[in-house]
Amino acid sequence: MSSNVEEFRQILSSSEKIIVLSGAGLSVASGIPTFRGSGGLWRKYDSASLATPSAFAENQARVWQFFHYRREQVLNVAPNAAHYILAPLTIPRIRQSISPNSKFTHITQNVDGLCTRALEETMKDYHETDVPYPIEMHGRLFDVVCTAHDCDFRETNYNSPICPALKGTELVFGAGGPEPMVRRSDLPRCPKCGQLCRPGVVWFGERPHRIYEIMRLADEADLCIIVGTSAVVQPASKIGGRVKARGGKVALFNVELGNHADEADFVFLGPCEQSLTEVLGI
């Protein structure tokens, strides 16, 4: 395990297939708390217990209030330096200066969309139009999906609030007040069939988007850069190990070592926006 910047840059420059796996730590500097820990708690319910199909089946209003709160958080923040350091790596002519002839894929567990926003802004700055977007394996916070099995409605919705009944419930949370009562009939409905909608994120117990493609990329990669994740949630937690098992290198950028630090060839501890800037220097 090394923290030698020049050694890592040499590995980066010679790599041919690079993947980045990013997690909640990437967005901390934007003001979004991590999914776990004291910043990830919601009243007496922690976020993991609310982000499940069973939680939604039991209390749709509570789950929608939680995700409305998260939506309102993200609507008021912007990408940070860590997002803007990773974004240019997606653009081939920029990446060539630090890793010639390489292919690059950004896989994110985040649902806040900040990776994509940073990339779109970077594309405009460099006048690029045909660049692969990050793979958002856990979906997107601003997507809304119909719960009816025979309805294919899905849309991206940035309305604030997403429905009148949820307006102000995020303020009650912030003040530590009692849980507001919201009727199920007043929650977001499908405009096509009228049935209840759900947030368009992947909940615990559901299959991540494009997971087979992600595992294929991990099997082919010769460098995996893990940024801002404790590597707890499966199957994302397996990605670094798969790269390592096939002879690839793993670099970890995080504020702590995490569960799979023993798989890392390089470890750069500290806030992502600082360590990525210092090491990559883009």
Model-found features: residue ranges?
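Conserved catalytic core of sirtuin-type NAD+-dependent deacylases
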Residues: M1-I282
